[in-house]
Amino acid sequence: MRILFDKNVPYPLLRYLAKHDVRTAEELGWARLVNGDLLRAAEEAGFGVMVTADQSLEYQQNLKGRKLALVVLSTNRIGVLEKHPDRLVAAVDAAQEGGYEFVRYELPPKRKPGCLG
């Protein structure tokens, strides 16, 4: 399957999807494309899934009738994402044409300024 990583997705995650043809928006010169334009370009280029950390896309874009699926990550913090790469893999595998898959990650609690612990 052809998968596109949006510019806000850390590229080290590529290794967890090695069985797929994964490209990044930056690699393709699409870093300045946003929302609908990026989805349209991805679809026209034959991508089946786009992975993004832009949680607002669900409300901005209607995928009904599109051939592209969207996998939305709840964070783009690589330290958090790499603790559970299986969640990304499962979401990509479950992605259906014209649909959304949401991948939730728990963030560590924020430390108060000046606290060492």
Where are these regions (language model features)?
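Acidic, metal-binding active-site segment of PIN/NYN-like and related structure-specific nucleases
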Residues: A42-N62
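Short, hinge-like loop/turn segments at secondary-structure boundaries
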Residues: R40-A41, K67-V71
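C-terminal structural segments of small proteins and small subunits
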Residues: A69-K112
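Short loop/helix-cap segments at secondary-structure boundaries that form the rim of catalytic
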Residues: L13-K19, L57-R66
